Every structure is written in C-alpha cells, then in structure tokens.
Amino acid sequence: MPEKMNVLGSRKGFTPALQHNSSVVVADNSGAKEAVIIGIYGYRGVLRRVPFANIADLVMVSVRKGSPDVRKQKFKAVIVRQRMPFRRPDGTWISFEDNAVVIINPDGTPKGTEVRGPIAREAAERWPKIASVATMVI
C-alpha cells in the first residue's frame, strides 16, 4: 500500500464529484462491471455532510453487476475517471464520459490485468501500479 499521505492526498480546491452511493463503472477486467461507492477513505468532513471523493481517491465499493464470484462483495477501489470537470494546475479543464474505478488488492496492486479506457494523469501519478496496466493516460 502506498504511503498514507499518497493514499489520502489533498482535497483542497476540488469540487465534490462522486459521493456516497454514487454508481460507477469498473474499468478493469476483474470480473466486476458496475459498483456503488459505500465509503471514502480519509474523508474528514462535517457531521451529517455527505462525504465526497475525486480523481485518485481511495474508496470502498460494493459490486452490483458482474461475474458471480465478485458480485455482492466489498472491495477497495481507486477513482480513475469522473464526469465532473476538474481543473489542472496549468489551467486546463478535464472531464470524462463516465465515472470509473479500478479495484485494487489490499497491497495496492490492481486486481485485474488491464484497465479499459483512459485514466487521469493524477491517478497515474498517485498509483503507479495502476498506470502500468492502463492502456491510456490523459
């Protein structure tokens, strides 16, 4: 697992993109197709405020659709795409066509062997093992 600071990162300046109970597409070939975010690691918010996550954040997901051996199970996952536009430090705005996650093992390696579709550069920098199996980094 990466260092604690790398896992949590900084949420300052990010707009709330994905929150608790958001549906996401699973972008790897681990057998899961769709999942729901049920927890966000490292969120330090206000009482009764719905926690949110952004690109490259670590979340807990529950698989809703997929192969029978992964359905109805909980996994850790990393957000690699989001539909909500976000601004990079150089001033460019980036948004993707869908909200997608990659399921990871407890040691931080991806559960699948390939990632379908592009992933954000922010996720690739924070999670280099995911970037190594990704087909495209934007």
Curated annotation (Swiss-Prot):
The keyword Ribonucleoprotein applies. Gene3D superfamilies: Ribosomal protein L14. It comes from the Archaea. Transmembrane segments: none annotated. GO terms for molecular function: large ribosomal subunit rRNA binding; structural constituent of ribosome. InterPro entries: Ribosomal_uL14, Ribosomal_uL14_arc, Ribosomal_uL14_CS, Ribosomal_uL14_sf. SUPFAM superfamilies: Ribosomal protein L14. GO terms for cellular component: cytosolic large ribosomal subunit. Keywords: Ribonucleoprotein, Ribosomal protein, RNA-binding, rRNA-binding. One of its GO terms (biological process) is translation. It holds the Pfam family Ribosomal_L14. Disulfide bonds: none annotated. The keyword RNA-binding applies. Belongs to the universal ribosomal protein uL14 family. Part of the 50S ribosomal subunit. Forms a cluster with proteins L3 and L24e, part of which may contact the 16S rRNA in 2 intersubunit bridges. Binds to 23S rRNA. Forms part of two intersubunit bridges in the 70S ribosome. This is Large ribosomal subunit protein uL14. The gene is rpl14.
